[in-house]
């Protein structure tokens, strides 16, 4: 039984703290008619309000995504990439500023792992709708390099995360003995104020350091973890999700990986594997948001941060093209780039390790533009699946 929650912000969505778990299982048979005939699609959706622990992913439930995944079906399938979380969950009941409940955190992404220290990668970024923030991107565009790890948190914690990263650089000699340096940490955000006491400012330096310390390769957690802990997506619980694709260009095998912090969209637009399930589920576990009478919030407002990693040798202008394909994956599952949404994306390549050189001319490799279609397709597919994984 699901009991109604009398909290002033959210009803019917109880605490996301364990051990309270809501499993919504809906088996829907949809008949889709087009010029080629009638297709019957059997779809199983399981949305689990969990913070940690073993849980199924979208493919485990039989959702038929397109494309071949890497070993972990994660951004960490791209060699060298490490991801870490700090997850902050505390309290229940009514939202009281400064007291909670707390549902927030920090996500850290290291393109070449934290042991590499200062090791810039070619990168570029793109914003579908800019009602949000990703710091450091003006220098990414200007220089063509991502020089720092990528951090993701909630809207009100961008500053503390940025400052903590800079302090960590000093404490760990990130620049390996250089006496004079400057940099612009890349910190992105989405708004978790519906499930989190966001104006209590609960993210602290210690949480940033924890996310950094926890960064590792291999299998990574999804859902209510890291910066995604308090996020909502397409009418249900959102959070952190990841996926990857492995493909060939001529005789070489490459990988594209995606990680998302998903906090966007209206339930009516939810689509899974091409099936418009949001229409069928429009009356399933609807929450009530008791906004002030003059609130300008519209259904579908929210944000999504997407980071794409690849080992394909790409130059910054080509990575811009990759970042511009990310919205196609977001749109497949129901994103519309609403006015109140911060849809901000960044793509980087781990190839060309010696490309950054302050003093000497360097020689780099780049894939021909005519060969990029598999990279585009892999990007769209990985983003689509990562978003659904964030909701499972």
Predicted regions and their residues:
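Alpha/propeptide regions of enzymes that mature by internal proteolysis
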Residues: 54-392
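Bacterial Sec-dependent N-terminal signal peptides
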Residues: 1-54
